[in-house]
Amino acid sequence: MARKHFGTDGIRGRANAAITPELAMKVAQATGVLFQRGEQRHRAVIGKDTRLSGYMIEYAMVAGFTSVGMDVLLLGPMPTPAVAMLTPSMRADVGVMISASHNPYEDNGIKLFGPDGFKLSDEMEAEIEAKLDRDVALKLSKPADLGRAKRVEGAQARYIEFTKRTLTRSLSLEGLRIVIDCANGAGYKVAPEALWELGAEVFAIGTEPDGFNINRDVGSTAPAALVKKVHEVRADIGIALDGDADRVIIVDENGKVIDGDQLMAAIAAGWQEEGRLARPGIVATLMSNLGLERYLESIGLTLARTAVGDRHVLEHMRAHGYNLGGEQSGHIILSDYCTTGDGLVAALQVLALVKRLGKPVSQVCRRFDPVPQILKNVRVNAAQSLEQDHVKRVIEEGHRKLGKNGRLVIRPSGTEPVVRVMGEGDNRDLVETIVDDICEALNAATPLAAE
């Protein structure tokens, strides 16, 4: 059944247009009703990033939860993984993160976590969505049973201590010059503080949120500012988080950007040497580079691929017993510690590897040469276009031409009327020709507007 509100990662859209106070309140009411089982008092934990619209959505959700008798604990600006961690820690029934991740400030969203700290399943999101269209007035609490709301003191310190405990107590970051870019987002206080407490010399940028500048020319999707600062202070490493701090990219001492594929390769190799991999392999998505797969194979590890989205990666990890997975974009999931992607915790694992090996970041984190990869978007009606015979023939011909020396991934976007066409292979010119041919066929099918 097609869903009206929930997408690939919760609910996301334009603030005060798609994401209105009314919708936020209804989501909280529906979620509160769903999670109120048993006679004890129930509670929700709410965190947010630094967008201006976060205040509006936060208070609307407080009204929703308390109206159905659920108490609310307000964390303020906190990373998404901190909300996931604090939900079970505070014995809450549900956790909420108000964020649109790497999107600009005009957007916002709602991510929901269960009492175990994991994102809700598709089935539970469908239940919540079904309740949105029903009359929740039948479930409203009596005046004496309304919920209470309060700010939680010390939540940031608790998360900082959690991140530090992912490293051995004897490990210090003393001697490392680190630039941390917090994207003017949710990690702007906790990330620099955690690195400083671990002994590093810290230079922080993207730590002056004003409600409007989240992800603006900073963060993991805009690394130019980080590269500049690394050169300026002659840092050993640069670390960039996104707006809700659940993804990370690295910049080495030479100012070169290192993506999630390279980070997974480095951590996998390091954990393999230490005997820490739960299985001889990792989990990544269809979009991860073929070079990663070849590198892992060369050291005796496998790569299990899933559909795009950190949720799919985590589901496969849990189902098959992996403890390392992620996405090229920098979502790195370390399930020994976290129930979701955690940019800071992943960065700490890289830093621990750098300290253990005693080598520059460029040597520690560059494990393979990426295969040339080309990604283009075509604005079309995906359902109609991908079913047309001509489009199918062009795609099949592309697969035939690449053979074992490359890959094609053609998939509809989960959030907009776009088909994403990704091709990779050893012959860049051939890949580009194949991708262009597929885009041309899609545009000729049912074009909206080519990008």
Curated annotation (Swiss-Prot):
SUPFAM superfamilies named in the record: Phosphoglucomutase, C-terminal domain, Phosphoglucomutase, first 3 domains
- What Pfam families does the annotation carry? PGM_PMM_I (PF02878), PGM_PMM_II (PF02879), PGM_PMM_III (PF02880), PGM_PMM_IV (PF00408)
Q: How are cofactors bound according to the entry's free-text note?
A: Binds 1 Mg(2+) ion per subunit.
List, in alphabetical order, the Gene Ontology terms for molecular function in this entry.
Answer: magnesium ion binding; phosphoglucosamine mutase activity; phosphomannomutase activity
What PANTHER family does the database record attribute to this sequence? PHOSPHOGLUCOMUTASE (ALPHA-D-GLUCOSE-1,6-BISPHOSPHATE-DEPENDENT), PHOSPHOHEXOSE MUTASE
Q: Which PROSITE patterns match?
A: PGM_PMM
Name the enzyme's class.
isomerase
Q: Where is the active site?
A: 101 (phosphoserine intermediate)
Q: Which InterPro entries match?
A: A-D-PHexomutase_a/b/a-I, A-D-PHexomutase_a/b/a-I/II/III, A-D-PHexomutase_a/b/a-II, A-D-PHexomutase_a/b/a-III, A-D-PHexomutase_C, A-D-PHexomutase_C_sf, A-D-PHexomutase_CS, Alpha-D-phosphohexomutase_SF
Coiled-coil ranges per UniProt: none
The entry's family comment says: Belongs to the phosphohexose mutase family.
> Which terms does the UniProt entry file under GO BP?
carbohydrate metabolic process; peptidoglycan biosynthetic process; UDP-N-acetylglucosamine biosynthetic process
Q: Where does Mg(2+) bind?
A: 101, 242, 244, 246
EC numbers listed for it are 5.4.2.10
Catalytic reactions on record: alpha-D-glucosamine 1-phosphate = D-glucosamine 6-phosphate
This molecule's function is given as: Catalyzes the conversion of glucosamine-6-phosphate to glucosamine-1-phosphate.
Give the record's keywords alphabetically.
Isomerase, Magnesium, Metal-binding, Phosphoprotein
The entry's comment on post-translational modification says: Activated by phosphorylation.
Name by which UniProt lists this protein:
Phosphoglucosamine mutase
